[in-house]
């Protein structure tokens, strides 16, 4: 499989030039635009990696899937979805527009920034430190990587430039969606987005989802399968920002992207896939990464549709 993956990588590398590095978070603009890597972890225990699969990047919006699972596990679906909706928006991920004009005032889904911030605020813990430790511990379990850490430079950069997220959070407090100290909740959110990962790490998250919430190494049912199905449904409808519909048609795999250049994909009952390519298209998705996943879906018949 490595040979086939390498060929897919090589034939799609030229797409990198059509994208840009993000500039609104200064630290992310320092990424290697030319990096491109794939990692596959399947349910038979096989793992394959080609290209820059060890290239470190911050998880960014891919983290929204993980914190949604933790919040659902902590609070249950009624609590979570009373405060956050289930519908795609068609708007950019950092848009506030529908939050203000649509009634009732709640974020449309957990994959946009407003929804993800609200979800993070639901995670239990007696202190800020405990909540962050729970989030980090959960990520370490799902990636099977006990060494995951927050990239402090990116975290600081997110915090300094996070005024739009701040304004959304204060609006949500005003309408009763968020109750905690807003700066503490935002700090948690900036931390979770700044966790440094590789393709291998996010492929393992994808495999966890593909395995129905069962940890591959231990066989432990960590998260109820109904929550996994919800997360995968959100990945299909909202996971690739406002390119989710096109991605569902052309690729047909539940996936979640992040502006760090990562895409985490999960093929139910088959495999998890991690792709990195920091050069982004105008929607905020890895421009070469999307093409790589499209070719993989075609070659291996991975579409769920």
Swiss-Prot record:
Protein's organism: Alkaliphilus metalliredigens (strain QYMF)
Keyword Hydrolase: yes
Pfam families xref list: Glutaminase
EC number assigned by the record: 3.5.1.2
Record protein name field: Glutaminase
Keyword Magnesium tagged: no
Source species taxonomy: Bacteria, Bacillati, Bacillota, Clostridia, Peptostreptococcales
Family: Belongs to the glutaminase family.
Record note on quaternary structure: Homotetramer.
GO biological process, one term: glutamate biosynthetic process
Binding site for substrate: 61, 113, 158, 165, 189, 241, 259
Keywords: Hydrolase
Single GO molecular function: glutaminase activity
Catalytic activity entry: L-glutamine + H2O = L-glutamate + NH4(+)
């Amino acid at each position: 499989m490595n040979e086939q993956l390498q060929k897919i990588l090589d034939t799609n590398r030229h797409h990198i030039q059509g994208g840009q590095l993000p500039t609104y978070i200064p630290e992310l603009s320092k990424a290697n635009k030319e990096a491109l890597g794939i990692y596959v972890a399947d349910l038979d225990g096989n793992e394959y990696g080609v290209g820059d699969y060890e290239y470190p990047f911050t998880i960014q919006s891919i983290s929204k899937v993980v914190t949604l699972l933790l919040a659902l596990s902590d609070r249950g679906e009624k609590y979570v979805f009373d405060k956050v909706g289930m519908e795609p928006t068609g708007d950019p991920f950092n848009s506030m527009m529908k939050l203000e004009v649509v009634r009732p005032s709640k974020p449309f889904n957990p994959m946009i920034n407003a929804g993800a911030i609200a979800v993070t605020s639901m995670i239990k813990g007696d202190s800020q430190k405990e909540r962050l430790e729970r989030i980090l511990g959960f990520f370490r379990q799902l990636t099977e990587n006990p060494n995951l850490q927050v990239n402090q430079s990116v975290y600081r950069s997110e915090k300094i430039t996070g005024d739009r997220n701040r304004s959304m959070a204060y609006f949500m407090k005003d309408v009763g969606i968020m109750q905690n100290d807003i700066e503490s909740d935002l700090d948690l959110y900036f931390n979770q987005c700044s966790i440094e990962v590789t393709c291998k790490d996010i492929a393992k998250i994808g495999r966890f989802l593909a395995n129905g919430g069962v940890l591959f190494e231990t066989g432990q049912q960590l998260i109820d399968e109904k929550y996994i199905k919800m997360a995968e449904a959100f990945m299909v409808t909202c996971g690739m920002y406002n390119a989710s519909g096109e991605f569902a048609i052309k690729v047909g795999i539940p996936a979640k992207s992040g502006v760090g250049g990562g895409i985490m994909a999960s093929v139910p009952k088959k495999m998890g896939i991690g792709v990195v390519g920091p050069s982004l298209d105008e929607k905020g998705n890895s421009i070469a990464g999307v093409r790589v996943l499209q070719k993989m879906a075609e070659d291996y018949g991975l579409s769920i549709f």
